[in-house]
Amino acid sequence: MTNAFRDMNSLNYLKSFADSSTAARSFSFEPTPQARVKYGGVFLFWSRQSEQQYFENLRARIPSGLTATLVFQTLTAQSLQSDSAQYEATYTLTAPHSVASIPKQATGKAQFLLLADRSRNWVLWRWIDVPTGSSSFSWSDLKGEFGQ
């Protein structure tokens, strides 16, 4: 996922998420409670395709020659098995987009639930964005802004 942001490659970003045609589950995203309230119906039917649309909308607003940066400050395994895993991570996503009214940095914590797809690639099937402070701009907020 970090490489997908570095390269601003939506196909590589999409490969991070479970697809029901190749995995036992479909992808689901749970935004922070604050973002769920703020962006209303945007997250109601959020899917793998929503992730692709958000990423492409964000990429379209980043000037040529610039790139986004995703950093996981901590990445802790909560559970590891041969076909599934759960991680908790703190993140900073910096996106030098051109929309003045939207913050360029999202920070927070996420819980990632992964499974091995039919090709034995690890993919996210559930992503829970966890609030870290009432005033912080989270990844959920960035998705809410660019996922519309």
Residue ranges and their predicted role:
Residues 1, 73-75, 125-130:
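Generic beta-strand hydrophobic packing signal
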Residues 1, 13-14, 51:
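Hydrophobic pocket/interface hotspot
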Residues 9-32:
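Short, well-ordered alpha-helical segments enriched in acidic and aromatic residues
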Residues 30, 71-75, 115:
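A structural detector for beta-sheet-dominated domains
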Residues 36-103:
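Surface-exposed, charged secondary-structure patches
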Residues 84, 88-94, 98-148:
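Short beta-strand edge/turn micro-motifs at domain boundaries
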